[in-house]
Amino acid sequence: MWVLINLLILMIMVLISVAFLTLLERKILGYIQDRKGPNKIMLFGMFQPFSDALKLLSKEWFFFNYSNLFIYSPMLMFFLSLVMWILYPWFGFMYYIEFSILFMLLVLGLSVYPVLFVGWISNCNYAILGSMRLVSTMISFEINLFFLVFSLMMMVESFSFNEFFFFQNNIKFAILLYPLYLMMFTSMLIELNRTPFDLIEGESELVSGFNIEYHSSMFVLIFLSEYMNIMFMSVILSLMFYGFKYWSIKFILIYLFHICLIIWIRGILPRIRYDKLMNMCWTEMLMLVMIYLMYLYFMKEFLCI
């Protein structure tokens, strides 16, 4: 019973955090574009996200006949994003999950299917094109992501995130494996469909992308799932390359740094062309990842690191 209560509290806190993450993003983008951002509703615009949420949820929703998949796909997307937060050690009771890295890779692999269903069931050319782009991008870059995570697992010799705390007491992977850190951050941006890799939501080409037919509460579920993934991947990146304890101030600062960096990149970089993205994956990044994997294997096997 105590575990269920802790899980419920964690999920509520994550959902509230999404609201303030959107406010932070709008504030940072506002200052990048030489404007103030939201500042009218109550104290410095702090309640702007809740006002937007009420407006979205109060909009009319049309229920179509024989449209179960149309409704369930955003729910599945939201559920998969929420389920990943089980790995977060809230009050320490989930601290020793033995195969937590494999669980994360499994959920990330499954998260492609709801977006594919959303695009296909919408019966819209723009949505279908957005979903097709997502599938091709995920097929290309999940290979790189798997090898990057496998390199780190080989270093710590474990499938659990818990080992990253003990392995990085003396030196951080962000320093020791700096090229791997940059490639991991790039793969994370692609996995999250963020600028400059947000090709499935290209406004100039696809109007709104895969979610063009969604509104009201179903759009809220898609929106929440995207921003929960941003927060979770920032947590994982901070853990795997810095190894600070979850409750430490250092971990929180590194986590906020990654969040702000993702938002800052959105404000300054243009969207990459699709063919250049595929070329970067198959001819450049995959080769670098494989070379680095062999280099780390040599270090572990012959230098006894």
Swiss-Prot record:
GO terms for biological process: aerobic respiration. It is found in: Mitochondrion inner membrane. Keywords: Electron transport, Membrane, Mitochondrion, Mitochondrion inner membrane, NAD, Respiratory chain, Translocase, Transmembrane, Transmembrane helix, Transport, Ubiquinone. It is an enzyme of class 7 (translocase). It is a multi-pass membrane protein. Coiled coil: none annotated. The chain crosses the membrane at residues 1-21, 75-95, 101-121, 134-154, 173-193, 219-239, 249-269, 285-305. GO terms for molecular function: NADH dehydrogenase (ubiquinone) activity. Its main location: mitochondrion. It comes from the Eukaryota. It catalyses: a ubiquinone + NADH + 5 H(+)(in) = a ubiquinol + NAD(+) + 4 H(+)(out). Pfam families: NADHdh. Its EC number is 7.1.1.2. GO terms for cellular component: mitochondrial inner membrane. Belongs to the complex I subunit 1 family. Core subunit of the mitochondrial membrane respiratory chain NADH dehydrogenase (Complex I) that is believed to belong to the minimal assembly required for catalysis. Complex I functions in the transfer of electrons from NADH to the respiratory chain. The immediate electron acceptor for the enzyme is believed to be ubiquinone. This is NADH-ubiquinone oxidoreductase chain 1. It comes from Apis mellifera ligustica.
